[in-house]
């Protein structure tokens, strides 16, 4: 999901380097250490939305708590599934590239 809808408005929501920095500032931990705890996932989604909005010059005036009040568990599950699917697709693409890279050496 490259976008998230809140109160009928669409906002960009994607992983950026800023999202990782925001997560570290919010939690004191690295985003790469996220398990499947709902609060961590929700915080990371918030960081992704806030950073993507900054990058795209889209106004995003929600605090983490305001954001959490407007997000449903289904939205969290959908976002998590989309991120997992994208990660699996990236791995598959890298595996396809690896054999051809070896042949050229």
Q: What are these language model-derived features?
A:
Residues 40-51:
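Short, hydrophobic/amphipathic alpha-helical patches that form generic packing surfaces
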Residues 1-6, 10, 18-21, 25-39, ...:
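Charged interaction scaffolds used for protein-protein
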């Amino acid at each position: 999901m490259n976008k998230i809808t809140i109160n009928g408005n669409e906002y960009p929501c994607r992983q950026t380097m800023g999202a990782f920095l925001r997560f570290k500032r919010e939690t004191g931990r690295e985003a790469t250490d996220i398990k499947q705890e709902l609060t961590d996932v929700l915080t990371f989604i918030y960081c992704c939305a806030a950073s993507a909005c900054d990058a795209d010059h889209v106004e995003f005036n929600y605090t983490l708590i305001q954001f959490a009040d407007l997000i449903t568990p289904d939205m969290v599950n959908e976002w998590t599934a989309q991120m997992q699917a994208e990660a699996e697709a990236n791995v598959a693409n890298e595996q396809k590239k690896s054999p051809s890279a070896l042949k050229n050496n």
